[in-house]
UniProtKB/Swiss-Prot annotation:
Pathway: Amino-acid degradation; L-arginine degradation via AST pathway; L-glutamate and succinate from L-arginine: step 4/5. The lineage of its organism: Bacteria, Pseudomonadati, Pseudomonadota, Gammaproteobacteria, Pseudomonadales. It catalyses: N-succinyl-L-glutamate 5-semialdehyde + NAD(+) + H2O = N-succinyl-L-glutamate + NADH + 2 H(+). The gene is astD. Catalyzes the NAD-dependent reduction of succinylglutamate semialdehyde into succinylglutamate. This is N-succinylglutamate 5-semialdehyde dehydrogenase. InterPro entries: Ald_DH/histidinol_DH, Ald_DH_C, Ald_DH_CS_CYS, Ald_DH_CS_GLU, Ald_DH_N, Aldehyde_DH_dom, SuccinylGlu_semiald_DH_AstD. HAMAP family: Aldedh_AstD. NAD(+) binds at G221, S222, S223, R224, T225, G226. Belongs to the aldehyde dehydrogenase family. AstD subfamily. Pfam families: Aldedh. Keywords: Arginine metabolism, NAD, Oxidoreductase. It comes from the Bacteria. The keyword Oxidoreductase applies. The keyword NAD applies.
Length: 488
């Protein structure tokens, strides 16, 4: 199978076998071989050769290609949504919103480029001070499986806009979405070698990250892989590295008047996308006492009515599956381990069908667990922690090595201001779901959640470097010479 796209040509991979499965039916959706180390090198060379021509195009010429890509995404929107749904397991309604986000990324990226990395000039003495930006060159993009179209797109679009050329290694769990996306770029008229598709798993990723011919790497995925990449790039300040690595995100609930609004916001924060968003709430901090008990009772009651279903099920489910049976087993194991260490079941996360990666929402009280693991449990499992006072809640929220998202549900603006001041996270929300990120704002965190390279609206920052110039149209002597220099 022609699984790779290098230098404008589709070719068979020579590396490890990659099979993409529907996570519910286990049907094989895509099968091929990943890129070998030699093919990675071939792609790097193709990108290097394509770089000068692409970088020297005018900004308007590159924008024209990007806008043509947006048009092709719209044309293939139904097919893309279908592909995202069947490969990730997310419901069609949600897959369609992902395609919309991919389309909207073009205009937002153009706006961001002009605002953050465009050209500025002004007089400085007898010269003109000019600020321009240049592309890095050949950059690798490692994409995740949870948003296999939108999140790689969030790196690829601003990278190409800035004049870079791209080596795209998608998740081995979602190769079909990547292939369809690249075909949209081809239809848009992107020149050969400017975007190269390298399917594959761990071995392909290692070969690409280690290739000395790349000038940068943009990654969205797990903390474990991100940390490995950071170590691999240690001592290489000449390479630009942008990492987005998720979080163990806290959501504090204060005593609010509208319990149902709180319950709805908690569910949206914890269980949308089957809990497979980087910003999903992992820890729910609830006040001790009768009000907190009532909130949890209502949350458990409503969550118990949520069923996970196939991506094309009608009527449409709120939740689809997690990405794979392996992921489902790992989440169930994590739940068992927490219960064995003192957690209490409020609503058990279950796998209704043993052969399908469908999980129901789980809610467990981990207040009594002596040493709670500070890990991102990437699925529909919400850990409840009861707190005695608001200061204690903020301290508990910050008790994590991560720092991506944090939220507060409260009727008190004063408490929100206190929470905002003391929260250690890149996204801090008030009375809105944690999962409500926007491409018109930066997206990133601190601590183990990233390396201070916020993406989304700020992706332009890591896709180009600034060049400051002092310019004068003619060479003239200054009115006053520097002391000690005589020209007569």
């Amino acid at each position: 199978m022609n699984s790779l796209y290098i230098a404008g040509v589709w070719q068979d991979g020579q590396g490890e076998v990659v099979n993409s499965l529907n996570p519910v039916t286990q049907q094989v959706l895509w099968s091929g071989r990943g890129a070998s180390a030699a093919q990675v090198e071939q792609a790097v060379q193709a990108a290097r050769q394509a770089f000068p021509g692409w970088a020297l195009l005018s900004l308007d010429q590159r924008i024209a290609v990007l806008e043509a890509f947006a048009a092709r995404l719209k044309h293939h929107a139904d097919a893309l949504a279908q592909c995202i749904g069947e490969e990730t397991g997310k419901p069609l309604w949600e897959s369609a919103t992902e395609v919309t986000s991919m389309v909207n990324k073009i205009a937002i990226s153009v706006q961001s480029y002009r605002e953050r990395t465009g050209e500025k000039s002004g007089p400085l003495g007898d010269a003109t001070a000019v600020l321009r930006h240049k592309p890095h060159g050949v950059v690798a993009v490692f994409g995740p499986y949870n948003f296999p179209g939108h999140l790689p797109n969030g790196h690829i679009v601003p990278a190409l806009l800035a004049g870079n050329v791209v080596l795209f290694k998608p998740s081995e769990l979602t190769p079909k979405v990547a292939e369809l996306t690249v075909k949209c770029w081809i239809e848009a008229g992107l020149p050969a070698g400017v975007l190269n598709l390298l399917q594959g798993g761990r071995e392909t990723g290692i070969a690409l990250a280690a290739n000395p011919g790349i000038d940068g790497l943009f990654f969205t995925g797990s903390s474990r892989t991100g940390n490995a990449l950071h170590q691999q790039f240690a001592g290489r300040p000449d390479k630009i590295l942008a990492l987005e690595m998720g979080g163990n995100n806290p959501l504090i609930v204060d005593q609010v008047q509208d319990i149902d609004a709180a319950v709805y916001t908690i569910i949206q924060s914890a269980f949308i996308s089957a809990g497979q968003r980087c910003t999903c709430a992992r820890r729910l901090l609830v006040p001790e006492g009768d009000w907190g008990d009532a909130l949890l009772a209502r949350l458990v009651g409503v969550s118990a009515t949520i069923e996970a279903g196939a991506f094309d099920q009608q009527p449409a489910p709120f939740m689809g599956s997690v990405i794979s049976l392996e992921a489902a087993r790992a989440l169930l194991d994590a739940q068992r381990n927490l219960l064995a260490n003192g957690a209490l079941t409020l609503l058990e996360m279950r796998q209704p069908q043993p052969g399908a990666a469908l999980l129901t929402p789980g809610i467990i009280d981990v207040s009594a667990v002596p040493e709670r693991p500070d890990e991102e449990l990437f699925g529909p499992l919400l850990q409840v922690i009861r707190y005695a006072g608001f200061d204690a809640a903020i301290a508990e929220a910050n008790a994590t090595r991560y720092g991506l998202a944090a939220g507060l549900l409260s009727d008190s603006e004063a408490r929100y201001q206190q929470f905002w001041l003391h929260s250690r996270a890149g996204i801090v929300n008030w009375n809105k779901p944690l999962t409500g990120a926007a491409s018109s704002a930066p997206f990133g965190g601190v601590g183990a959640s990233g390396n201070h390279r916020a993406s989304a609206y700020y992706a332009a920052d890591y896709c180009a470097y600034p060049v400051a110039s002092l310019e004068a149209g003619s060479l003239t002597l200054p009115a006053t010479l520097t002391p000690g220099i005589r020209l007569s």
